[in-house]
Structure formats: structure tokens, C-alpha cells
Regions:
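Anionic coordination/interaction segments
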Residues: 1-211
């Protein structure tokens, strides 16, 4: 097929290019918490109600397409890229998206660094887990900056709707946009990290276009 194929053994749909005609979406969910994940890491999460309790921002049909979502940035000596290609759109040496039953894996490789971003919603808990695995395929030591990003919405269209504190569970929806910076390690970034203090500053290497 032109853009992907079915992997019957793993029960996955495998997408071989990030340049699909439209975002190709996988639906993840448990009892109360749900996420939509595109083949480039776009999408959004919501708690019980997709319209009234939307938690992160996402442009599905509007231009530009597939912006915002479940993003992880990798800074390798000034080369900034994403495992799912968007939004940096740095050309990858290899790319694969695996949409499975209840999970999505975005696999990208650039300059000898392989990254796999696995997204899933665990049963029995109201959260999304983004698990990042990094592999250095070269013989030389490498130093990387890795940081995650979400843009919270918390409700109806954010330009008009008031947000009631009673709408969402307490504390765990107080997110920051850059929950962690991880150096030379494999890390996990969950989008329910609480933050009681001020939003931490963005790293100096923040790509152009990020807030």
C-alpha cells in the first residue's frame, strides 16, 4: 500500500511515511480518560466528555493540520527533531508509526540516534503515558537534550469558555508545558504531572514557534 500496511502478526497498522493525506488517528482510552493520537504525534486528550472536558489543544480540521499534541523534542547538538516528525519536520533517516490496539508507537531515527515514543492509556487510571526509549547506534558517546510538551485547554474552545474547577479532578490537571529535561537517558513523560509552583522556563534550545 502507498502509505502503510497491516502487520497481522502484531495486529498493528504500520504507517511508513509521516506525509499522509490527513492525520491518521488511533483512539486510546480507559473507563474515563481518552486520547486521540495521529501518526505524527498530534492529537488531544479528554476526560469523559470530548467537547466539555477536553484537556489539550489540537487542530484536527483547521489549518495548519495536526498541530499541537503529544510532543517530544530531541536536541542532538543543535539538530532538533521529533520521533513522529511533526512539528519540527526535520527530515528523519527512518520513520515508522505503529497503531496498535490501545497504543501507538512512533519510531524515528536521526544521525545514529533511534527514538521510540510509545503512547497508551492504562486501564483503571485517568492518565496518558508517553514512554520514550532512546538508542545510540554509533560507537561514540552522545549528549542529548530531551523535553516534552503539551498545550492545555481544559474545556470548551479556550477563547470563549469559562473553566470551572469542579469540572476536573483536583491537582492532577495542573500541568506545565515542559515537565522535564532528560539528559543521556531514557525517560517517561506523563501528561498528568502536577505542578504547584510557577511554570518552569523553556530551555534555551527551544525550537522556533513554540510558546
Amino acid at each position: 500500500m502507498r502509505f502503510g500496511h497491516f502487520d497481522d502478526a502484531r495486529r498493528e497498522y504500520v504507517i511508513d511515511t509521516p506525509r499522509t493525506p490527513l492525520p491518521w488517528i488511533n483512539y486510546l482510552g480507559s473507563e474515563d480518560f481518552f486520547s486521540l493520537v495521529s501518526n505524527t504525534g498530534g492529537g488531544y486528550s479528554f476526560y469523559r466528555d470530548a467537547r466539555l472536558r477536553r484537556l489539550t489543544r489540537y487542530r484536527y480540521n483547521n489549518s495548519p493540520l495536526d498541530m499541537d499534541g503529544h510532543r517530544i523534542y530531541i536536541n542532538d547538538g543543535g539538530t532538533i527533531w521529533n520521533p513522529g516528525w511533526q512539528p519540527a519536520k526535520t527530515e528523519l533517516d527512518s520513520y515508522t508509526c505503529r497503531h496498535g490496539l490501545g497504543y501507538t508507537i512512533l519510531q524515528g531515527e536521526k544521525n545514529g540516534i533511534a527514538a521510540a515514543q510509545e503512547l497508551f492509556v492504562p486501564r483503571g487510571d485517568a492518565c496518558e503515558i508517553d514512554r520514550l526509549t532512546l538508542e545510540n547506534k554509533t560507537a561514540a558517546p552522545r549528549t542529548l537534550d530531551v523535553f516534552s510538551y503539551v498545550d492545555s485547554a481544559c474545556g470548551m474552545p479556550w477563547t470563549t469558555a469559562p473553566i470551572s474547577s469542579a469540572t476536573f479532578p483536583p491537582a492532577r490537571w495542573k500541568w506545565w508545558k515542559v515537565p522535564s529535561i532528560i539528559r543521556q537517558s531514557t525517560g517517561s513523560a506523563g501528561i498528568t504531572t502536577p505542578c504547584s509552583g510557577p511554570t518552569p522556563p523553556l530551555p534555551a534550545s527551544t525550537p522556533a514557534g513554540m510558546p
